[in-house]
Structure formats: structure tokens, C-alpha cells
Amino acid sequence: MRKDAKKESMPEGKESKYKNYPIDFSKMPCAYWSDSAKISYLQRRIIVWSIMYYEHDESCVPDITYDEVSKQLVELQKSVSKQEWEKSTYYYAMFDFNGSTGFDIPARLLKKDRVYLTGLANVIHSQWKKDQAKL
């Protein structure tokens, strides 16, 4: 970087907002995502992990990670307006998610979302199994 070039950074006060969470939204490219995009991202992770756990009987993430990301999602949902939260991709399936369990979420998905997220979960699970075999 040139000496005179300015380093791109978050507006003051925004960085600390995400510092103690497992997913750091203060870093690029997600630093400028809308709150509904951040919620959608966390929802997608929770749903994929739930599919893996409840349908493959295995998880690629420890329970503590699932719990921390769930807590981050719940707190982010509480911190935004209802209108912003309702813009999230999977609001219709996770409107009452409180972080305690995700067993019923996959069954609530629209067929197209269910197919997409199950496919994603299958690919992630398959790669995780290959990685585990190398250990």
C-alpha cells in the first residue's frame, strides 16, 4: 500500500459492535452488508448445521460454536427493526428462533430453499468427512 493511501476501515464505533462474536462482520467484504444480509448469512449457517446434525447425525462444528452463532443471530435480530429483520432470507422459517434448537427449521423451509440448503449441507458434510479421514 502506498504511504499516502488511506486504509479502508469501518466507521468509528461499528468495529466494537461485532468484536466478541464468532462471525466478525467488521471485516471486508461483510463490513458493508445490511443488517438483513448479516441475519440471512447467520440464518443460513444455522440451517445448514441443523440439516447436518439432524439428518446426517453429525456436525462439522462443535456445540459451542453452534450456540455462539445462534446467540449472535438472536442478538442481531433483537437489535434491528422488525422491518429489517423481516427482509432476511429465511425470516419465514426462523421468525421464532431463540437459539435453543434448530430441529424444526428444515421442515419449515420452502421446497426451493430446502433443496438448495440440503445440497449445501451435503457438500459441506462430504468435504468435512474427507478432511476428518486425513487426520
Regions found by a protein language model. Give the residues of each.
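Phosphate/adenylate-binding "loop-and-lid" substructures adjacent to NTP/NAD/dNTP-binding pockets
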Residues: R2-L135
